[in-house]
Amino acid sequence: MNAPAPHTAASFSTQLTPPAAATPTRQTAKSTRARRRGLPAPCGADTFHAMKTQPIESEAPVGSRIQQLVHGSYFHDAWSIRAAEPGLDPLSQFLRVARSTPAWIDGAMRLRNRLVSLIGLKDLGGLSAVNLSKNASEYKPGDRVGIFTLLSTSETEVLLGDSDKHLDVVVSVHRQQSTSGDQAVVTVTTVVKVHNWLGRLYMVPVRPAHHFVARAMVRAIGNGA
């Protein structure tokens, strides 16, 4: 199979530009559902006391870069958990989890790659296919990080993405530390923008599969090494 085409951070620049006028319909509905279920918002004052050690459905963190992309997206979700290693920056959190990806997730990716190659979509490889000898501090925007391209990174949030002819996906790993620094809530948000009917068709099986994969990856952030 062909190797994934290289991407640069610039290729996603339009996705990271806030819309001129946000339309809060889907996100408002999602926020309302979260409040009704009693889920703590990632940036709430009681986050560190209320957050569980199992993933909970939440919202894109207020003020995060990924929040700019939620409105108008075809699909988005967010999952939060109290981090087992609160001192790790967001990219290090992602790398730790990716390097220990469960076999069933990599197996699902191999199946996905075989099937989508029949309709001309990219082989992304496996989620665990990250450079084991490369530290988070060595990555620069535009570098490949497993199946994603690194778009931006900071002490509070890392954005990873990929683009193909059918859709664009951006994943955020956001860390909110307590004042003392001994606790942190990590929120993983996924935003998908589809380009055409193929993207919508692709999302039919991917949407439910993503639910299980996202929860498993976020759960790993809450589990110790």
What are the functions of these language-model segments?
Residues 202-225:
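A conserved amphipathic terminal alpha-helix motif
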Residues 137-180:
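Hydrophobic-ligand binding "helix-grip"
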Residues 48-131:
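Hydrophobic ligand-binding cavity/cleft-lining segments
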Residues 52, 128-132, 140-143, 148-151, ...:
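Mature, function-bearing regions of proteins
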Residues 3-5, 12-22:
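Residue-level detector of structural "landmarks"
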Residues 8-14, 26, 31-37:
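Low-acidity, Ser/Thr- and Arg-rich intrinsically disordered low-complexity segments
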Residues 165-204:
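Beta-strand/loop substructures that line and gate deep hydrophobic ligand-binding cavities in soluble
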